[in-house]
Amino acid sequence: MYSVIRSFGLNGLNGFAVAVEADVSGGMPALSIVGRPDSAVRESGDRVHAAARNLGFKWPDRRITVNLAPADVRKTGPVYDLPLLLAVLSSAGQIEPPPEETAFLGELALDGSLRPVSGVLPMALTAAASGVQALYVPAENAAEAAEACGDTMLVYPAHTALEVVDALRGIRPISPIRCAPFDPTDAWNAAPDFADVMGQPLARRAMVLAAAGGHNVLLIGAPGTGKSMLAKRLPGILPPLTREEAVETTKIYSIAGQMPKGRGLVTVRPFRSPHHSASAVSLAGGGAQFRPGECSLANCGVLFLDELPEFSRESLEVLRQPLEDGQITVSRAAGSATYPSHFQLVAAMNPCKCGYYGHPTRPCTCSLSAVRQYRSRVSGPLLDRIDLCVEMDPVAFDELHGTASAESSADLRRQVLFARQVQAKRYAAPGFEGVHCNARLTAGQVRRVCRMTPAAERLLRASYETLGLSARAHDRILRVARTVADLAGKQLLDEDSLLEALQYRAQEKVEL
């Protein structure tokens, strides 16, 4: 007897429909799973057999063939355990076939309980778009799956496979779970406050510009100057996530298996801080089974690279594509996958190997050639993609013990939100599709929105010729100047806007 159960799998960041077909026929007792299953899917036969027996069902003492269609796409993970069990029981005549518009996801324990699986949100979104009206998932995945409900699909949380069978039989119905209200502003309360940072007015200003325009930042300073403190506080002044950004970020974290249990959407902008020993694969993603790397896990948030020159050259060069394109493509023998990587890079480095080159009181033990060698580990093309660079001096005693209070994150956030509102209004016009901050302007769009006063234009020409700027560096200076002008409420870029943008140039501060 033949039966088919609807389920879904993952291909990169998106789900795809899978038909779990089962056929119970005469022959020697055996279970064969075909349709390009990986090892986890092949092992599911043993889990399903034990779960069926422990739930009180009779396992068919015949030949069982299970096909996962389409057969030309590789199937990974234990997500097919529950639909495989239902397909076998239905094919053996022990339960009625579920309605065609019903789908199932979930891993089975040996006692028949359901365990959470990765990637539920993208699969649930595909299910809703495919006309599924009822989706049964493990209870711990239900809040996440409910974010895909819409008006046509209901999500049913289950703790065991027996609950699913009883619900299908009408014995014990399961109440569907509702989508939780979306409120990303609560994330601001959890972020550390800028009021804790003493001194460093130029670096604080750079962080405001970074948040207001979506720019990348490099902080250079001796140990203890506050580089890490500033980086960790940047998410607290960024605008709240939109629902579209939250869905995209949640899909990434769900696929990576990093969603907290029982959570719906990710409402906090990510802050990722990989160690400098991180490999290129851990940053880019990939592996035997495609998984997002740190560049994608920082999507819509902040990627903080402390001790930047200590990263391997291969790891740093991985950053070039996502910084330029906002996405990263991972290619392996089994195929390729593209993940979004719209992150803000905040990098920090010491001025030299010992950390005290140029320090006012502590002597540097590095030779000039050693300092040059240390700084040369950060390539010119990578520096060309960093908009803001700040050299940070040690904090003076009077600044640490002064009575003047520093601006709080709430104060800085108001400035950032004002500038973002200006940009949102500007980029709502035709020709700016996909642009929501100054840092994402293309070269052609920069010409449209970065109009200057005559004096500012003369200053830019002189700077371009004197500093030997590249075309990319020229455009990045204009983007930063546009952000400075937006914070000040100016329509045209004036000399002050350009001068402030020029002082943040990274190339001259890193290269000796």
State what each model feature region is.
Residues 18-24, 283, 387-390:
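Short beta-strand elements
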Residues 105, 158, 284, 304-308:
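Hydrophobic residues in beta-strands of the RecA-like P-loop NTPase core, especially within AAA+ ATPase
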Residues 219-260:
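Walker A/P-loop
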Residues 1-218, 222, 228, 331, ...:
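Peripheral, non-AAA+ core regions of ATP-driven protein-machinery
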Residues 111, 305-312, 355:
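Catalytic P-loop NTPase motifs of RecA-like helicase/translocase cores
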Residues 208, 265, 270, 280-303, ...:
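Conserved alpha-helical scaffold flanking the Walker A/P-loop in AAA+ ATPase domains
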